[in-house]
């Protein structure tokens, strides 16, 4: 049985936020995880993150901002068409005003707003708010 690296990392971030930590270290890492964190940084949910030694097991240090209420990775990949993204976000997120669903698309890993703009669907990786 393999580890769910992205799910473990997101749970670590949420637990550190609840404890009031300023930063957290994530091990092991993956490129999907760094793309997920890049989207969180662009949207202002984390301050910054640094990837150390990406070619080995590596680690990522994340500087927290105190804005993450919850973030989860889906353990199964759910296919979503471009027209169904809006319905999926309404079901998943608590309100329409904050939070993002992260989707892996042919154009790369995007948040739901960017995927709707580009009119591409894909598989849902997770969400944060």
From Swiss-Prot:
InterPro entries for the chain: Ribosomal_uS8, Ribosomal_uS8_CS, Ribosomal_uS8_sf
Source superkingdom: Eukaryota
PROSITE patterns: RIBOSOMAL_S8
Any one annotated GO CC term: mitochondrion
A GO BP annotation: translation
Protein's UniProt keywords contain Mitochondrion: yes
GO molecular function annotations of the record: structural constituent of ribosome
Main location: mitochondrion
Keywords per UniProt: Mitochondrion, Ribonucleoprotein, Ribosomal protein
Protein location: Mitochondrion
One Pfam short name: Ribosomal_S8
Family, per entry: Belongs to the universal ribosomal protein uS8 family.
Quaternary context: Component of the mitochondrial ribosome small subunit.
Record protein name field: Small ribosomal subunit protein uS8my
